[in-house]
Amino acid sequence: MTHQTHAYHMVNPSPWPLTGALSALLMTSGLIMWFHFNSTTLLMLGLTTNMLTMYQWWRDIIRESTFQGHHTPNVQKGLRYGMILFIISEVLFFTGFFWAFYHSSLAPTPELGGCWPPTGIHPLNPLEVPLLNTSVLLASGVSITWAHHSLMEGNRNHMLQALFITIALGVYFTLLQASEYYEAPFTISDGVYGSTFFVATGFHGLHVIIGSTFLIVCFFRQLKFHFTSSHHFGFEAAAWYWHFVDVVWLFLYVSIYWWGS
C-alpha cells in the first residue's frame, strides 16, 4: 500500500514525534527545576530542542505538501477533521479553568471572607489594559479574516499586509499582558483568585504566543509563494486557531476581568 499511488495520508517514518516528546519532558522537568532550585539549564535545553523539532517537523510537512504533492484533497479533509478535533480538545481544556473559577466565585467559602474577590485582593480595572487587550485581539480577528479573503481572491500583497498586521497585534497583546502581570497587585500564590487568574490568562497568553508563531511561519511561507486560493490548509488552520484564541479571550474578559472584579 505504501509503495503505490493513492490519495490517502501515509506518512513517512519520522523522528520528530519522539524528539518532540523528549523536549516536552525536558521543558516540564526544567520548569520544576526552575521553580524549586532556580536553575534554568534544563528548561533552556528543553526549549532549544523543542524549537529545533518544530522547525524540522514543519520543514518536512512543507516539503511533503507543497513540493511533493502528498496533501491530496482526501488528505486535506483528514487534516481539517484533525484540526477541528484539536480545537474541541482545547475548548475542553479551558472549560476546566472556567469551571474552577466559577466554582470558587459563585459560592465563596468562609476562608475567602464569604465574598468575591476574596478579602484583601484588589482586582485589575477591566476598563484599562484588559479592555485595550480585548480591542487588540478583536482587531487581529478582523485582519486575519481580511488576509483569508485576500488569499481566496488571489491578492497576495493584501494578504501579506493583513497577515503582518495580525502578527504585530499578537505581539502587542503579549507585551501588554506581560506588563499587566508585572504590575498586578496580587500573585499566583494569593489564594484561589490568584491561581485561577494567572493559570487561565497565562495559558491563554501561551496560546497567543503559539498562534503568533504559527502565523509567522505562514507569513514566511507566503513570501515564498507556498499558498494558493485552492491549496492553503496551513494558513487556514492558523486562522481557525487564532479565532479560537479570540473567542477564549472574550470569555476570559467577561468572566474574570469584568464580572469577577
From Swiss-Prot:
It is a multi-pass membrane protein. Its main location: mitochondrion. Residues 35-40, 106-128, 184-190, 257-261 are mitochondrial intermembrane. Residues 1-15, 67-72, 153-155, 224-232 are mitochondrial matrix. CDD domains: Cyt_c_Oxidase_III (cd01665). It comes from the Eukaryota. The chain crosses the membrane at residues 16-34, 41-66, 73-105, 129-152, 156-183, 191-223, 233-256. Component of the cytochrome c oxidase (complex IV, CIV), a multisubunit enzyme composed of 14 subunits. The complex is composed of a catalytic core of 3 subunits MT-CO1, MT-CO2 and MT-CO3, encoded in the mitochondrial DNA, and 11 supernumerary subunits COX4I, COX5A, COX5B, COX6A, COX6B, COX6C, COX7A, COX7B, COX7C, COX8 and NDUFA4, which are encoded in the nuclear genome. This is Cytochrome c oxidase subunit 3. It comes from Litocranius walleri (Gerenuk). The gene is MT-CO3.
